[in-house]
Amino acid sequence: DGLKPLLEAYDIGFKTGDTESALFAIYQWLVFKFLLGTSLESLEADIELYLRQMNDLKKAQVAKLTSTLHQLLSNLMRKDNVDDPTRFHGYALSEEQYDVARGKPCWNAGICRFHGVLLTYFGQHIRQANILVEHGHDYLAKTQVATPCIMQDTYLKGVSCFAAARETGKSHYAKLGETCRSKIKKWVCKGNPNVRHYEALLDAEAMAWQGKHSAAMKSFEMAILLSGRGGYQQDLALASERYGEFHLSMTKDSDEGIYRLKEAARYWRSWGAHAKAESLERRNIMEFEMGLEKSTDTFIGLHISVSSFHFDGCDELGS
């Protein structure tokens, strides 16, 4: 229901002959659908439908922006760039278009924001954090005023900055993460209902960096709860993944860590991000196999214990 005005704007635009505005409205509708966790398969079908319309009407600018979103989905769904899912040109966005776009601020910002999604999702946290260092935290807000992607971009850069701080031990990354966290907290205070799960995960990352494990665990669990309640499948997956990595690297609770990572892979796959799910499973295959081996040993031990009890009982009855 909240997206209905964008569909109405699309209809009004075509009825009045303002097809440019109509198609920009539908582009924003597609972006919101992505942010809200819509199934990637369903979203891809909508993108392809409206892209054909944009190209038929020769609306090049909005078609280019929509193509960047299409490229993002193609990579996530394992339909393109299988060898390197963070490469941001291919089936939907040609290398030539990509090179041209890099020289145009508005289009370049569009590429940067969706490319940043891939960098965070595929664990390229230092690269993502360095982009923030290069462009500044308000780059997207200055080049694409009022785009809803500002919320997600700030959140993902914050996650990557805290992750980069933990990977490198460099506190300046954590300071950048705190800048992103502070911005989101201000939005929450002003009544934005769409970023509370972002706030919770950044709280968890901040507490993890500070070594406050109990507080971090509570915030990770809150991020998972809020993401799940809101239907944000991708954010549920990311929060679960970050929680799993937190346990493996910081609390050394391998059982909980493996469980959370397996849940994350399941959530990624349910959303349609098969490339991401497979990447996560490959990266953690050793931990997964160790967990399976441990579970098997526990089962065998339990079986032996029960069998021994049974035979002891029979002997006792027979005596």
Range-by-range predicted roles:
Residues 39, 92-95, 310, 316:
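Helix N-terminus capping/helix-initiation residues
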Residues 21, 45, 49, 238, ...:
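Low-complexity, compositionally biased segments
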Residues 27-38, 249, 283-296:
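Compositionally biased, low-complexity linear motifs
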